[in-house]
Amino acid sequence: MRSPKVKFLTIFTFCIFITKMSFASNSCSNEAGTMFRIEPNLIKAIALVESNLKKDSIGKNRDKNNNIKSLDYWLMQINQMHIPLLKKRGIIKDERDLLDNPCLNIKIGTEILYNHFSRCGVTWQCLGTYNAGFAMDNQKKRQQYAPKYILYIPGLMN
């Protein structure tokens, strides 16, 4: 059984980590929003919906047979399909960079969202492509995905 002191230190450390993450997320979301002309509250909402701000979260995308077909990394759940281009551009060395640097993850995710908006317009349907992609058979998934942000944005506006 842990002593009260150890429990306190564990909780204290966790609180500092969450506070640090929150400040980093706010600062980085604001910076990324300015860089790509996207509302910072939307960026924060995406991070909340995608990863629930869970450190080192790696999403596993599965096919109909439950086989892993791709991975998504941390805050903005950057899909592994982006890794080769990010390496080629010198932005990352490997996927670990997406897990170790929250600001970098937020900026890359925001750039991906910017590219989606440039392709299909600033609409809720286009926002759904951030998670579900552009495939025609993902139409229903896109429509279900975008409204999830609406739940988070009002609380972020305060």
Swiss-Prot record:
Signal peptide: 1-24
Cellular localisation: Periplasm
Keyword Phosphoprotein assigned: no
GO cellular component, one term: periplasmic space
UniProt-recorded name of the protein: Putative peptidoglycan-binding-like protein
Main localization, broad class: periplasm
Pfam families associated with the record: SLT (PF01464)
